[in-house]
A protein has these predicted regions:
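A conserved ligand/cofactor-binding region detector
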Residues: 10, 15-834
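Short, Lys/Arg-enriched N-terminal segments with co-localized hydrophobic residues
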Residues: 1-13
């Protein structure tokens, strides 16, 4: 039952009882264990106690909060047991540092992991409540934004499910990134006040508190160099427990909250300077306000630096403190601790760890560097040089003077290594130095991550190959064995079992329920792909999901869409390289073709977009506005009727994705070949039976190889062809002049056909395509339109489409985040999995 009697644990290690042994209840799958709590501990009783109302009268929110608290109590007990078992076995721990964790809602996942969905549903219905209404009122945790954060969330799910001793470390953002509103087709950012009613899942840890310094100076004393910060904050911990599935193991996401060393300047307050009196509190609070603050200003860049350092300082102090409590020494740190950097945003963990080992614990430089390299590993997520993070030396010198000294020393020793092993190669030295001397001197965070880590991985085979051939080619010469590949994955618990219960029921009938933790069992579906009964079941599940999404669109946007139409979906961060604009160009081409030949047998299609643009990214915002202008024109044109609809769903989130992805027929994965590191949305769509139209890029390649390229709609230039076209001199205007359809599309957009009140609105956007086209949309346009024609023809034959949908599902077994974590555990972290 959803009982409330489990203790919420005390102390930094949160341990109050012996670790589970084989055969203990705590070592058995969750579904085999049930509480025998008496009536007063039931969920309705807890609803009544927390709301002061009868369960029948309590609101869905009160039901959600009570269910969350009851679930949290059971998860806290599992946390207690997991941490105690890790200490007993002296297991090596993984610590995953990430600026974002896009967790989504937690209640549905917790109920599934605890095996309590049935009891929750029954209790809610007995009180006259709809379980779905209760689940719906939970806010998405605004701790992330895009693929980087969602990958981190999937990893925590798999770390827990595979029993890997693990902590995630992030910041407790007060307002997330932003809520996206659309006004007159334009993105408007508003604070995401997701914590206004508190977070029923988090456990505050007032006993876990670390000082975090800023600015100041470095002095030399009898024990060496020592940093004397001019400012000091404190980091307080909030724990979010991530349950494993078919196990009682959990992972812990520890989020840091900044507090001032002195909350109020009382002297200023007494003088009547109330703003000055509150300045210390404001300086601390702003650290946690927003994920990825606008960095177009100096103040914004400084805030980002402070956020990154605050995260890593608190996290590394916590890791070292836990290790010292367990072992009392640091010479075995690399044997018991793994710190993984999710991109370069947490890279300051490297000089922070070295500072703690050398300055605070008296370790020699060589010993500290050896431990650091054993501990640290780094995942790269981009192939674009301009996206690699750097920090001005002057900014680090002001805010983190001791860390800059340490970075200089790492670089000095690295360059001496190069002089020894690559004598006379001055070009190599310039390229791989941690300091970029061109213009304003800057520290290259990716370079620091490579030099100070023992492993560096890409996230798809193509990405990892290109990584060592292009942006990190010189580092691969120096460290040929340091680079590896671990292809991304997604958790099937959320992205299939939770998001798509209709399809999951069909899979259970065919395979049994174990596919949730053994996703490779999906391969058993491939020989059944032509089975008419399976095809009917898969198509029926898809239709039910499309009807659900159509209701959401009608409710939120007032637009009626036909569930029988082809749902063509592109949902992801709005960025030029992801090429939502190419999709929009095809929509215009299709619209023009329908107008020109209205009596042709057009396949009805609903094109669905969702995604946020970074607040300072003007071009991405212009693309959003163009899509809305196209939608406004197409959707009201009586000549089009229901043969084409365009929908933009605002404020993209995990919960919205859980509604959209199961309903998609076609998954748009359009990145310019060689630019998308991996992608995970592509995997989620295919797992739910959508077919992919996409470029030969990122994980699309491995997915096509697993499923069979004949079951994909691959189009466009490959990465090597992109490079060759650029090398020969890419002229996008030639494509415009030679393709009448493309010319008509661009002329219509540039001429104001979709913005009659402001005819020049998109002239600059079109000019950028004609004169530069950095992501080669015009080069791929004709192939994309041709691939879309193949989509139409195939969708018109449901049994053929269903066959390919089933084969896509069957081929996704290798794209579980469980497989990904097993690969990390084996090739990078050297930890055991269950």
């Amino acid at each position: 039952m959803l009982a409330t009697g489990s203790p919420e644990c005390k102390g930094n290690d949160m341990t109050t009882r012996p670790a589970p042994q084989a055969g203990d209840a705590a070592a058995r799958p969750a579904e085999k264990r049930r509480s025998s709590a008496p009536g007063p501990d039931s969920l309705p009783a807890r609803v009544e106690r927390e709301s002061g109302m009868a369960p029948e009268q309590a609101s869905p929110y009160m039901w959600m909060r009570a269910a969350a608290h009851a679930s949290r109590a059971q998860l806290a007990e599992r946390m207690n047991l997991s941490l105690r078992d890790d200490r007993r076995t002296e297991a090596k721990r993984v610590h995953y540092l990430s600026m974002e964790f896009l967790m989504g809602r937690a209640l549905g996942n917790a109920l599934a992991a605890l095996g309590l969905h049935g009891e929750f549903d029954a209790a809610a219905r007995a009180a006259g409540k709809q379980p779905g209404d209760i689940l719906e009122v939970e806010a998405d945790a605004a701790l992330g934004n895009g693929g980087l954060g969602r990958l981190a969330a999937c990893f925590l799910d798999s770390l827990a499910t595979l029993g890997v001793p693990s902590f995630g470390y992030g910041l407790r953002y007060r307002y997330g990134m932003f809520v996206q509103r659309i006004h007159d087709g334009q993105q408007i950012e508003e604070p995401d006040d997701w914590l206004r009613h508190g977070n029923p899942w988090e456990l505050e840890r007032p006993e876990v508190r670390y000082p975090v310094g800023l600015a100041g100076r470095v002095v030399t004393d009898g024990s060496g160099r020592r940093w004397l910060p001019a400012e000091q904050l404190y980091a307080g911990a909030y724990d979010f427990i991530v349950p494993g599935h078919a196990t009682e193991r959990v992972a812990v996401l520890r989020q840091w909250q900044a507090y001032p060393s002195q909350p109020v300047d009382f002297a200023a307050f007494s003088r009547g300077d109330f703003a000055g009196a509150g300045a210390p509190m404001l300086a601390a609070e702003v650290i946690n306000w927003v994920l990825y603050p606008d960095d177009s200003t100096h103040a914004g860049r400084e805030l980002r630096l402070k956020q990154e350092y605050f995260l890593v300082s608190a996290s590394v102090q916590d890791i070292v403190a836990r290790h010292m409590a367990d072992y009392g020494r640091l010479d075995n740190l690399g044997d018991k601790v793994s710190i993984h950097l999710n991109d370069t945003l947490p890279t300051l963990a490297i000089p922070e760890l070295l500072r703690i080992l050398i300055d605070l614990h008296g370790m020699t430089w060589d010993a500290a560097m050896a431990q650091c390299q054993k501990v640290m590993s780094y995942t790269n997520h981009t192939l674009m040089p301009e996206a690699l993070e750097t920090w001005p030396v002057s900014m680090l010198e002001h805010w983190l003077p001791r860390h800059l000294e340490i970075i200089y020393q790492v670089n000095d020793r690295f360059l001496k290594h190069l002089a020894l092993h690559f004598p006379g190669d001055e070009a190599l030295v310039r390229h791989v130095s941690l300091i970029d001397e061109n213009g304003e001197r800057r520290v290259k965070m990716a370079a620091l991550s490579i030099v100070a880590s023992h492993r560096v991985n890409g996230v798809s085979r193509l990405h990892s190959e290109l990584m060592v051939q292009t942006i990190f080619a010189d580092y691969a010469r120096v460290f040929p064995d340091r680079f590896c590949n671990v292809t991304n994955g997604v958790t099937p618990r959320r992205w299939l079992a939770q998001a798509n219960p209709a399809l999951s029921a069909t899979l259970d009938e065919r395979l049994g329920p174990q596919w949730r933790i053994h996703l490779d069992q999906l391969a058993q579906l491939a020989p059944q792909a032509a089975d008419p009964n399976l095809q009917r079941a898969v198509l029926a599940a898809k239709r039910a999901n499309k009807e659900r999404l159509a209701q959401l669109v009608r409710r939120d946007l007032g637009i009626t869409i036909d569930p029988a139409s082809l749902f063509d979906v592109q949902i992801k961060r709005i960025h030029e390289y992801k090429r939502q604009l190419l999709n929009a160009l095809h929509v215009v081409a299709r619209y023009q073709a329908i107008i020109a030949n209205p009596d042709a047998p057009w396949q009805p299609r609903t094109v669905i977009f969702a995604g946020k643009a970074a607040s300072a990214y003007a071009t991405a915002k212009t693309i959003i506005r163009l899509i809305h202008d196209i939608a406004r024109t197409v959707n009201i044109d009586p000549r089009v009727r229901d043969r084409l609809k365009v929908v933009y769903l605002p404020n993209y989130s995990v919960s919205l994705a859980e509604n959209i992805i199961p309903a998609a027929d076609l998954s748009e994965q359009l990145s310019t070949a060689g630019t998308e590191a991996s992608g995970t949305g592509n995997m989620k769509f295919a797992l739910n039976g959508a077919l992919t139209i996409g470029t030969w890029d990122g994980a699309n390649i491995e997915m096509a190889q697993a499923v069979g390229a004949e079951h994909f709609f691959i189009f466009g230039l490959h990465a090597e062809q992109v490079d060759e076209v650029r090398r020969l001199g890419y002229d996008p205007r030639l494509y415009y002049e030679e393709n009448a359809q493309l010319k008509a599309v661009l002329d219509a957009i540039a001429g104001g056909a979709f913005s009659p009140g402001d005819p020049g609105r998109y002239r600059g956007l079109v000019d950028s395509l004609l004169n530069r086209d950095a992501y080669m949309l015009l080069a791929d346009f004709a192939a994309y339109v041709s691939a879309q024609q193949r989509v139409d023809a195939m969708f018109a034959t449901p049994e053929v489409w269903a066959d390919k949908a089933i084969r896509n599902i069957a081929g996704m077994g290798g794209f579980s985040s469980d497989r990904t974590i097993r690969d990390y555990a084996r090739t990078i972290w050297n930890v055991k999995v269950q």
